[in-house]
């Protein structure tokens, strides 16, 4: 998963919902490790995803449990398409502008913890 921020190895849950005709919820539970652009494995992992100039983190999830449930309460929605706004904003900023934005906005989490985006967290 590419993050469009977290640090270290910690618990993570990813939830998938079916918004179509067949209801279903699937949850993946595990421990996640964050890979940043400064890490050796960044380039090889990034190749696994569509190009995204704004990609700042990849989460490597070691699965511990997979569960499904009925999803009967999940509403039905029709996807109209992706919004171009974020990609357009990132293209206009360019790599240097995005890095500056990350340094201003993404080095500390909402609860005041360092994200490790530019330097390793011990």
Where are these regions (language model features)?
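Binding-site signature for planar aromatic cofactors or substrates
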Residues: 1-122
